[in-house]
């Protein structure tokens, strides 16, 4: 780092620090935008603007943070009409992309079982590695060709491990870890069932465990999306792409209670050394959020 990552530092028109692009600055921009809006409309505003800000969001299996907050909102029967998440959705320039949905995600651990033995006597052992080629062929069969809103479901193998560090022992098992990113043609249980079916077509000697990170979701609210698109066009003159690509986000939890879209800064440096954002982008984002709030709450603005 050229600066202390935990102390914001401005140099050459850029703000450096951990979270500068993902996504602390977006929170600050929305707060300033809200302050400006309330000053302008303090006698005409009868809605509610809330900030959902959490900590420990990435600890464990996302049990804390947003997920817990959504449980609390449900328990209190609080009604939320719309939500905007300030994720850094833009690949290269501000105004380029809005996320209006996300693919679902499941992590799998497959243990293919065999019988350990000496390599000199393969007839007395059962090498689980021998089945891998057939298993991989089954797992990599296409799930679908995509949908109207999403790209095709995709399986990616991330590791293969027999825990065998010698060259003269046939392993008793081999572990394969893989992830499936699935579209709106499936729910998580359907994906799990299909994976089991494909493995069983090759072998019954296996164990399979899975962890669902989130279901796929899509925002069907025209008002929410249109309000944000108009705001971006007004400030940047860009016509944003409406996208469902990329990884999971906390919007997957929020989608359980209300329509949600995601828009923030450029994400080129997020999670990297010297994470930064241009000051002019922060100012533009604040203007976009300000216009978005007006579009949502002031009918005369939305109907322009």
Annotated model-derived regions:
Residues 88-93, 100, 106-304:
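Metal-dependent amide/peptide-bond hydrolase catalytic core
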Residues 23-101:
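Acidic/histidine-rich catalytic neighborhood of metal-dependent amide-processing enzymes
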Residues 14-29, 118:
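Glycine/serine-rich anion-binding loops at beta->alpha junctions
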Residues 1-18, 38-45:
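Acidic/His- and Gly-rich active-site-bordering loop/insert found
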Residues 13-14, 18, 50, 54, 81-83, 154, 243-245, ...:
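Structural motif
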Residues 4, 11, 26, 104-106, ...:
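Activation loop
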């Amino acid at each position: 780092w050229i600066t202390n990552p935990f102390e914001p530092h401005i140099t050459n028109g850029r703000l450096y620090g951990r979270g500068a692009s993902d996504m602390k600055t977006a929170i600050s921009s929305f707060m300033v935008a809200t302050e400006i809006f309330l000053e302008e409309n303090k006698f005409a505003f009868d809605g509610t603007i809330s900030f959902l800000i959490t900590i420990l969001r990435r600890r464990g299996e996302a049990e804390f943070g947003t997920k817990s907050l959504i449980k609390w909102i449900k328990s209190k029967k609080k009604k939320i009409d719309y939500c905007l998440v300030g994720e850094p959705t833009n690949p290269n320039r501000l105004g380029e992309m809005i996320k209006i949905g996300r693919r679902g995600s499941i992590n799998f651990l497959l243990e293919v079982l065999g019988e350990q033995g000496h390599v000199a006597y393969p007839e007395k052992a059962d090498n689980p590695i021998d089945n891998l080629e057939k298993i991989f062929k089954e797992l990599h069969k296409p799930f679908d060709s995509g949908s109207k809103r999403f790209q095709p479901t995709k399986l990616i193998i991330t590791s293969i491990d027999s825990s065998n560090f010698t060259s003269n022992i046939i392993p008793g098992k081999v572990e394969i870890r893989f992830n499936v990113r699935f579209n709106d043609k499936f729910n998580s249980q359907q994906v799990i069932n299909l994976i089991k079916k494909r493995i069983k077509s090759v072998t019954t000697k296996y164990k399979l465990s899975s962890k669902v990170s989130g279901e796929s979701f899509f925002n069907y609210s025209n008002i929410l999306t249109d309000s944000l698109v108009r705001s971006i066009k007004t400030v940047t003159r860009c016509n944003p792409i409406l996208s469902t690509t990329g990884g999971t986000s906390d919007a997957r939890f929020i989608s359980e209670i209300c329509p949600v879209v995601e828009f923030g800064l450029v994400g080129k440096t997020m999670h990297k050394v010297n994470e930064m954002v241009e000051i002019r982008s922060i100012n533009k984002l604040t203007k976009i959020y300000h216009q978005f709030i007006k579009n949502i709450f002031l009918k005369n603005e939305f109907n322009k």
